[in-house]
C-alpha cells in the first residue's frame, strides 16, 4: 500500500491522526531525552525517600514529553532485611495515550538487579536513573542514584535517526558507469 502525507484538506477529505504525525516524526527523530539543559529530566535526591525529576523533555516513538517543573517522586519504604533497585523511567503508553514518569521496583534481594524496561508495541520506557535502596534505609542520598540518561541502551539523547548514509550501492553504480566509458 502506498501512503503519502500531509496535504491540505479540501472539504474534509484529508484528516490526520496523532499516530500519522508520530510516524512521520519518528522517521527522523530518535528516542531519548533532550540534552539541553544538561539537567533535563535528571533525578536528584530530595528529602527522605523523595526524589525530584528536574524540568526536561523526552521523545519516544514520535511523541513528545515535557516536564515543566521539578516533579516529586516518592519511593516505597525500604525492606528491613533485603535491598532493591528502583528505576525511574519516562513511559510512553499508547493504550492510555499518555507519557509520564514512573518508578519501577526490583524484587528484594541481597544482590538486586534493576527492573527491565518494557519496550513493545503499547509501552516503551526510557530509564532516567537507577536508585539503590539498601535494607533499612530511610533516606536516599545522591550517591545511591545512577544517572542513566546518557546510557544509549537504556535512554540516550534525542538525535537524528539517520546517522550515516550507506553509499555502497551508489558507489557500485558509479564504478560500473566509469568502467563502461573508459
What are these model-predicted stretches?
Residues 5-6, 50-182:
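Beta-strand-rich solenoidal segments
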Residues 1-59:
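N-terminal "first-domain core" detector
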Amino acid at each position: 500500500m502506498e501512503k503519502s502525507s500531509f496535504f491540505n484538506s479540501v472539504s474534509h477529505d484529508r484528516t490526520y491522526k496523532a499516530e500519522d504525525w508520530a510516524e512521520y516524526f519518528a522517521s527522523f527523530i530518535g528516542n531519548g531525552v533532550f540534552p539541553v539543559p544538561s539537567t533535563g529530566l535528571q533525578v536528584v535526591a530530595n528529602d527522605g525517600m523523595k526524589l525530584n525529576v528536574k524540568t526536561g523533555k523526552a521523545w519516544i516513538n514520535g511523541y513528545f514529553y515535557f516536564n515543566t517543573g521539578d516533579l516529586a517522586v516518592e519511593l516505597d519504604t525500604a525492606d528491613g532485611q533485603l535491598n532493591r533497585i528502583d528505576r525511574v523511567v519516562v513511559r510512553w503508553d499508547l493504550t492510555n495515550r499518555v507519557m509520564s514518569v514512573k518508578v519501577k521496583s526490583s524484587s528484594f534481594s541481597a544482590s538486586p538487579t534493576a527492573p527491565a524496561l518494557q519496550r513493545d508495541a503499547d509501552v516503551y520506557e526510557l530509564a532516567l536513573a537507577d536508585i539503590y535502596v539498601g535494607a533499612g534505609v530511610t533516606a536516599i542520598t545522591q550517591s545511591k542514584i545512577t544517572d542513566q540518561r546518557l546510557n544509549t541502551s537504556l535512554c540516550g539523547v534525542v538525535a537524528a535517526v539517520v546517522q550515516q548514509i550507506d553509499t555502497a550501492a551508489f558507489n557500485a553504480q558509479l564504478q560500473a558507469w566509469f568502467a563502461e566509458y573508459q
